[in-house]
Each structure stands twice: as C-alpha cells, then as structure tokens.
Amino acid sequence: MTEYYDLNLLEKETSEENNFHTKNQQVREDLSILYSILVALEQLEKAFTKDAVSTSDFNSTCELLIQQWESCFSDERVTQAFGSFEDFCSKYRLQCPRAIKRIQEGISDERSQSNSTFSNAISTTAEPSIAMNDTTPQTVNPTKAPSNPSASIAKSIAGLVQNFITTLDAIRLNFIAKDQLHPLLSELIVSMDDLTESLKIQVSCRNKLVQWLIKINNMNITDQLNDVEKRELLYDLEQAYAECYSLL
C-alpha cells in the first residue's frame, strides 16, 4: 500500500492550550483513541475482505471497537471537538470509508436492537421471568474480547497508532528532554514489538528508533535534543509509521 494516514493528528495551538497537564489533555487522548479506532477498523475490514479474519472474530472485534468508540463520546467535550465524520477525517487527512460505514451501521443496529429489546420487554410484562431469561444471553461478557486473537491484534494496532501520535505530538510541542522523550519512545517500541510479533513481521525502521532510545538514554537528565536532532527524530518516526502501515 502506498498511501498512509497523516500523523499530524492535532493542529498546533498555543503551548498553554497544548500542555499535557491541562484539563484538555483528556479530550486530546480521546481524539487520539478515536483516530486509532478508525485506522484499526479500516484494517480489520480490509483483512475480512481477504478472508484473513473469520466471521465470528470479525463481528466480535467490530463490536468491541464500536463500544470503545461510543465510550469516548460519553464526554460532551469530545463530541464537540470531534464534530462530524467529514470534519474529523478532513482535518486529520483520514481515508477510512469502510470504518466509517461500519461504525454508522453498528451504532444504528445497536439502537434498533435496544428499541426491539425494550418493546419485547413491555409485551412480556405478564411473564417477567421469561423476559429476563430471554435477555440474559444478550449480556456482553467483558472478559471475552481479550481472548480473541483478532481483537487483540486490533487493540495492538490502535495502541501503536496512538503511541506514534503521542510521541510525534510531544516532539512537535518541544517535549524534547530526556525525561520526557525516553518513556514515550520506550512505550512506542514495546507496542511495535508486540504487534510485529503477533503478525510475524519485521520493521526495518525499528533499528533507528532503538538507536535513538540508546542515545536519549545516554543524555544527561537536563539535556535536550537540538533542532537538527529534533527534525531527524521526527523524520525517522514518520518513516517508521509509514513502514508499519504498509505492512498491515
């Protein structure tokens, strides 16, 4: 695949508005999660069309991702910041037509099912015990999804994308000191290793990121990357992301 998603997830604002310790950080994190879900779901849809994922795994993973999607929108601030699908995808240069359609259909189906269940409950009020027994199998088991290999891979993809976004965003905001960069880059490499191990693939750009991690680890606690190093690290991270995406 030649195209890949633009990682400039969040437009540059003032340093005060983008401070990781402000109240808006949770909104930024939720937007990153939404971005990750769209990317993961788009890849899942493509894998399903190639018979790389079974129907049962596909359905359960879609259900999990849609539940996570709706959970993010429980915060009204996230809803306002997200806007519409068109606004969000245009702003962050996303091309996820399959994912958008699946989410829209999934939410619509859930609402229809909820209304149907409610109507059935009313019609069987004369036999409440039967109604309760009928609805019991519809309860979602929260421990079921993690045991699903496809769900685990989708979660790993979403986590890797989010780590790329967080690391790149931090560097662009000049979080370039050792104590700021080291944990971000470490977590990114770990999440990359988890995914590549699951998919049995190798990422050549990983070596460059490891070299950066070693270099940052050898810095003094007060040291920061200079402008040239900052640009080089950003470039290597973007190259690594592009390679990861092309392998999915």
Swiss-Prot record:
One GO BP on record is: late endosome to vacuole transport
Q: Work out whether the entry's keyword set contains Hydrolase.
A: no
Instruction: Name the chain's protein.
Output: Vacuolar protein sorting-associated protein 28 homolog
| The species this protein was found in | Schizosaccharomyces pombe (strain 972 / ATCC 24843) (Fission yeast)
Give the quaternary structure. Component of the ESCRT-I complex (endosomal sorting complex required for transport I).
Topology of the protein relative to the lipid bilayer: Peripheral membrane protein
Report the function annotation for this chain: Component of the ESCRT-I complex, a regulator of vesicular trafficking process.
For the VPS28 N-terminal domain, which residue ranges apply?
A: 3-113
Similarity remark: Belongs to the VPS28 family.
Gene symbol? vps28
Cite the PANTHER family for this sequence. VACUOLAR PROTEIN SORTING 28, ISOFORM 2 VPS28, VACUOLAR PROTEIN SORTING-ASSOCIATED PROTEIN 28 HOMOLOG
Start and end residues of each VPS28 C-terminal domain: 152-248
User: Region Disordered: which residues?
Assistant: 128-148
Q: Name one GO molecular function term.
A: protein-containing complex binding
